[in-house]
A protein has these predicted regions:
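Non-heme di-metal
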Residues: 1-146
């Protein structure tokens, strides 16, 4: 079986996982915004939440195009948010992992539309990780200091 056929054979199940993960990440950032120490951090988390929701929507659209069915994704549990600094550090690691995961999908994708989708998604995830690092310095109150 050639690589393109294998890519497509496994893609629907990967997309279901990605839809679930991106939806979960969107909810996580929305909840994290409630812990934000200032408006700048709150705005950043809400921007990330919207980005992650858009990633899920993009993957749902691809799933539908491939299968002709709406994706059946298990319900997303409400996120358990650790203390602020731990949450930031965990998200930096998660976002950098997503950067790599979607970058690998981009390189493996047999058609341009999927390559572009995964590439752009990987860039946005990488941007999230980098921007999260800016929240680790300059926090004045003890509760949010990293």
């Amino acid at each position: 079986m050639n690589d393109g056929i294998m890519f497509y054979a496994n893609l629907p199940s990967r997309l279901l996982e990605y839809i679930h993960d991106e939806t979960s990440d969107s909810l996580y950032y929305r909840e994290l915004a409630d812990q934000a120490p200032d408006q700048r951090a709150r705005d950043l988390f809400m921007e990330f939440s919207r980005d992650e929701a858009q990633h899920a929507a993009n993957f749902k659209e691809v799933y539908y195009r491939l299968t002709g069915m709406q994706p059946m994704v298990p319900p997303v549990e409400p996120p358990q948010i650790p203390p602020y600094c731990e949450a930031i550090k965990a998200r930096i690691m998660a976002e950098s992992g997503d950067l790599v995961k979607y970058g690998e999908e981009s390189v493996s994708a047999p058609d341009q539309m999927l390559r572009d989708l995964f590439y752009i998604t990987s860039l946005i995830e990488g941007r999230h990780g980098l921007r999260l690092t800016t929240l680790m310095c300059g926090v004045d109150d003890e509760k949010h200091r990293c």
